[in-house]
Amino acid sequence: MSRLKPWWAIALAFVVTLAFEAALVERKHAVFAGGFGQSKVVDQAGEWLVFVPALLVAHAAQILASFLVLRAFHGRRAGQALFVLNFLFLTVGIGCALLVAKFEALAYFSDAMGFELIRNLGGGSLATAALYVLDEAVLLGLAAGGAALAYLACFALVKRWLPDWKRGEDPLGWRHLAGLLLLAIPLALAADGRPDARYGLSRFNAFATVNRGLRTLTDFDRDGYSWFSAQRDPAPFDPARHPLALDIPGNGIDEDGFGGDFRFTGGAEPAPVLKLPARPRHLVVIVLESFRGDAIGRTVAGRPVTPNLNALAREGTWVREAYSHVGFTTQSGKSIFGGALEPKQGGPSLFRDLKAAGYRIGVFSAAPEDFGGISETVGMRSSADLFVDAEALKAERAHESASLGSLALDGRIVLRELDRHFRGAADWARPTFLYLNIQEAHFPYSHPDMPRFLPGRLAKRSEIEAANRAMVERTYWNSAAYSDWLVGRVVARLKAQGVYDRTLILVTGDHGEALFERGFLGHGHVLDREQTRVPLILSDPALRVAGPVGLADYRGIVLRGLSGDAPPPPRSSVFQYIGTIDRPAVVGIVEPGGVWTTLDLETEEVSFSDTGLRARYRELRAGSAEKARADRLVHEWARQRWLGRS
């Protein structure tokens, strides 16, 4: 048998891992062929001329670095054939397994998300978010066990059949790695000039790692931005000026490079003072998880999806332009009750307002309300006289998972608990505030005990994919119909107990849900109608609220309604963001008529929903309507950042 030279192992690892990662990247991101919902595609000759050499050099550096580190670790034993086995097991075996784990996570979180967005989905905890993914990837543990058995089998074969080699036959060294890294510098700079090529390269681990190192080395002023960051630092030696910098009002400096020097106008509107009449009304707030605004009035196969909400809208007030500020439950819940985009812990909230006013407060939630600090931020648990949530009834959960981020109860359990404490008019002797949370429309849109309201087969969890879009949509609308049925049962109970006419009911959603529109499933990916428009229905026909309305406006609306005051004046826009206000991936405003203007802070691309125009901010013509809209967005973003500091 011929001797196995180490460079054969390097070549094998290079080809196998690159081909495997490329297949996964293409399947997830479609960076080569393009596809549904993908606008960043490497499809031009100039892009390929940058993409291919940059990818090959970065991947070669990654494989060679693994080889050299492992060789140093083996020391004198690096000439043994066992070293080749360990090298291939590390790069091909473990490397490919980690790639699968990464793309399993991205299948849930979407590539639009960074750590801040994952933390949002995990309720503020990266650890919880990780458990959220692992909950979906139990097979990875079995794969790891299989890999260990495969390694032991290969170990036995190598020890028996493969010869060792002389160290002199191993000419590769650290100087070769240094040469590859030096070559990567101009290639990374060239990629920055081709946004689609840069996007494609950033999906590959090797290039992302090399670029991260270059970004750190050239961040001279340590402001987090450099020559190699997605948002190139225009002032590399001035830590006060960089992308996402807080623009100081009126100092003559444009710190963030958008919209010129910020001029602060329009402070936060003070919350109305609660002035209760002699006989205060009760309040019932119902939050429907992942409930789209266009569910109201929709029919599927000739059947109405929301007959109960339709009736409530006819009798009361239906605000057709209501929007979440973000696409995540935890932050939305805080905004609904705290009356701010990012309420401060211990700050004003509906729970604290009504507790101080003498209300009896009950929380009946199909979700774990401590998740992500919702309860603590708005004083939910501390204010409640009655508190029942999914964590308290974990044994009755609707799905198998017991992790905090996945807990949910069937809505009928929520009704059962409500009935235990509210059986008749005597239980409403005091002014009462009830908060009910219904989880039915959350992914995977069904559970074993969910009733059927719409015809046709519903999708199993394993069948939720773009190829089954029609079935997935039907499953979602069935869950929305079940949510509506539950709302109808709550209204019926209020009427039966004689308190409906003295109760202000508010029904809304925490965010919307994409059903493969533009290639997305779920929420939190983009700022658009499907993922951020929510229903807002008030039982009081006199409370004529004009849109657009954001979740942070609800506290003021409710306090005015309970006080008998007129609703607040209409606002000019609702601010939205992905990430956090200070470090967003995307910011946007939605103006009357459902017109979105969004700014991607990585590419500096501004998108206009009504015209379909996409252009870099600096390419917008001065004095144009598009430039004015983009500047309104930039101004509102800066204003909201300063309001959050007040």
Q: What kind of feature is each model-predicted range?
A:
Residues R212, T265, E269-V285, S290-L458:
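Active-site-proximal alpha/beta segments of enzymes that process anionic O-linked groups
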Residues A268-K275, P304, M450, K495-P541, ...:
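Histidine-centered active-site microenvironments of extracellular/periplasmic hydrolases
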